[in-house]
Amino acid sequence: MIWNAAEKISRKEMRELQLSRLRWQVEYAYSHVPFYKKKWDEIGLKPSHIERLSDISKIPFTVKTDLRDHYPTGLFAVPNREIVRFHSSSGTTGKPIVVGYTRNDMDNWTECCARMASAAGVTRDDIAQIAFGYGLFTGGFGLHYGLERVGASVLPISSGNSERQLMFMQDLKSTVLVATPSYVLHLTEIMEEKGIAKEDIFLKVGLFGGEGHTPEMREQIERRLGIDDTQNYGLTELCGPGVSYECLEHTGMHINEDMFIAEIIDPKTGEVLPEGSIGEIVYTTLTKEGIPMLRYRTKDITRIMYEPCACGRTNARMDLVMGRSDDMMVIRGVNVFPSQVESVLMGIDGIGQQYQLIVTTEKYMDRMEVQVELLDGAILESYSNLERLTAEIRHKIKTVLQIDVKVTLLNPKTLERTAGKSKRVIDKRLKAF
């Protein structure tokens, strides 16, 4: 089902709408956000210079460090009294990125997620079980309001407590599941251990995001649960989930082009690439009041497809993300940077400078092991000291990352040294891209 007429207007109409909204957004950002005004003034750029869509390439990029450097609200365009919701994502040095939504921003976010739900076939006859975390993470709330807008009944169970998830799934006859794909496969393992067959549940479709997943994972989810697996894409910096989404044709993720302009650039040079090219996707918001984002570099590698979809939607589609242009990892839906872990480790007495992160998949769930050298191997001879230090590291890392990790303490000079850049991460997971 097509929820909004904006999803099927002609390319000409969409470009005209985008240009009108782009002009408004750049004027708004320039006049309300000192960061943008200063940046533009330094290069002699004025909002009036944006006359055509192609002029967007004149606008300087915005990057994650810009938000971090202006923590918490330095890029906001409105005072806090006009913000009705704050969300945040983890930061690489302990400070998170904070975003704010005005009432209109919340309405547009809800609309984006309603389109996502509708594209997956969700209606007012469905019961949607949201197994995303609620809180500062945008995942749970975005889908919550979007699903309510299409009329679905929402079960905001949040993440974890798998036995409780399955109990409600059966008792309330949930038909839609919202979660990370790795958690879904974890649930199927528990179902099979308990003798719960797919015929014993009522799920028909999944709205999965927060991390990529392989075609093999999708095939397993669909086969073991008997559902249609749809993927979606979003970033906290833009709005959270709802930037783009799959329909039931599975031919790419439809971009909400009336809300965002997407470009593909060369991640090394920053030059805009021709249509059909694979590169880094860059997004510009078109309707944001709280914190407008102009040419935000996502670091995600993909391509954009412009031909109409068989579902009837004409908005452009982004391919599933093929990789990252930086060192960020996504573990159980959480953005993790090696520098976050390093920052924690370097602040603990007795810990050396050499460490390594081992990322694996166990029972379809991402796991991370932190291997770190000690300054003095004698600590390993004392069980109480070893246990205390291990617990301290685990606790401090969980405080920063919000995920549990395994910690292995090593003797000095255990890890391999190289003359070049140290290999901090060993990712043994099946590649999702």
Please give the residue ranges for each predicted region.
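Conserved S/T- and glycine-rich ATP-binding loop of Class I adenylate-forming
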Residues: A29, S88-T92, A128, L177, ...
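Short, well-ordered beta-strand segments
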Residues: I127-I130, V282, Q371
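Adenylate-forming
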Residues: Y183-F202, E219-R224
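AMP-binding/adenylate-forming catalytic core of the ANL superfamily
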Residues: L177, T287-I403, G420
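Conserved helix-loop-beta element of the AMP-binding
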Residues: I127, K194-H213
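Conserved AMP-binding/adenylate-forming
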Residues: K204, H213-P308
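Nucleotide 5′-phosphate-binding alpha/beta core
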Residues: M1-S88, T93-E111, R115-A119, T123-R124, ...
